[in-house]
């Protein structure tokens, strides 16, 4: 009997460690998806470096209490899977939200963003953000625009001076 309890404690500690280490964890209800759809979702998440796991709700509740994210307990009902991302904050929310558009059976319940419990609306807002590279390129284009405009103006002034001088 104690061997089973030890295994369960290890699973609880594994879940708790995943919550501690992850930038984002998104909790979903996968009820209504067939095996092929779940396999396709797992593949898409795996390609993005996201771990997608199904744990018993009771063990997940204990892990959530261990990492002091008890507000997440409300989402731990019914069939629950969790997508953990250690690197990209946006990717799990974006991939799951896009998958949900094609497969309405998938239900996003909530999650954790950088150690804080997030609501469904916050997860959806996060899904609408571009990834890191997209945000960097947007920032660079915003920073580059004034310099480019200044260059156009100075070129126009130089051309105007040339025309007046000639």
Swiss-Prot record:
GO terms for biological process: translation. Pfam families: Ribosomal_L10. InterPro entries: Ribosomal_uL10, Ribosomal_uL10-like_sf, Ribosomal_uL10_bac, Ribosomal_uL10_bac_type, Ribosomal_uL10_CS_bac. GO terms for cellular component: large ribosomal subunit. Keywords: Ribonucleoprotein, Ribosomal protein, RNA-binding, rRNA-binding. GO terms for molecular function: large ribosomal subunit rRNA binding; structural constituent of ribosome. Coiled coil: none annotated. Part of the ribosomal stalk of the 50S ribosomal subunit. The N-terminus interacts with L11 and the large rRNA to form the base of the stalk. The C-terminus forms an elongated spine to which L12 dimers bind in a sequential fashion forming a multimeric L10(L12)X complex. Forms part of the ribosomal stalk, playing a central role in the interaction of the ribosome with GTP-bound translation factors. Belongs to the universal ribosomal protein uL10 family. NCBIfam families: PRK00099.1-1. This is Large ribosomal subunit protein uL10. It comes from Oceanobacillus iheyensis (strain DSM 14371 / CIP 107618 / JCM 11309 / KCTC 3954 / HTE831). The lineage of its organism: Bacteria, Bacillati, Bacillota, Bacilli, Bacillales. The gene is rplJ.
């Amino acid at each position: 009997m104690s061997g089973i309890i030890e295994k369960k404690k290890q699973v609880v500690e594994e879940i708790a460690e995943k919550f501690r280490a992850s930038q984002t964890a998104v909790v979903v209800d996968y009820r209504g998806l067939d095996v092929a759809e779940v396999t396709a979702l797992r593949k898409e998440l795996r390609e993005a470096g996201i771990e997608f796991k199904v744990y018993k709700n009771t063990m997940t509740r204990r892990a959530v209490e261990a990492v002091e994210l008890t507000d997440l307990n409300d989402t731990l009902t019914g069939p629950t899977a969790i997508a953990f991302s250690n690197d990209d904050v946006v990717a799990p929310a974006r991939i799951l939200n896009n998958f949900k558009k094609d497969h309405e059976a998938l239900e996003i319940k909530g999650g954790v963003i950088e150690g804080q419990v997030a609501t469904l609306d916050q997860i959806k807002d996060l899904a609408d953000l571009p990834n890191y590279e997209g945000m960097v390129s947007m920032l660079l284009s915003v920073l580059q625009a004034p310099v480019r405009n200044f260059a156009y103006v100075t070129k126009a002034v130089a051309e105007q001076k040339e025309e007046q001088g000639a």
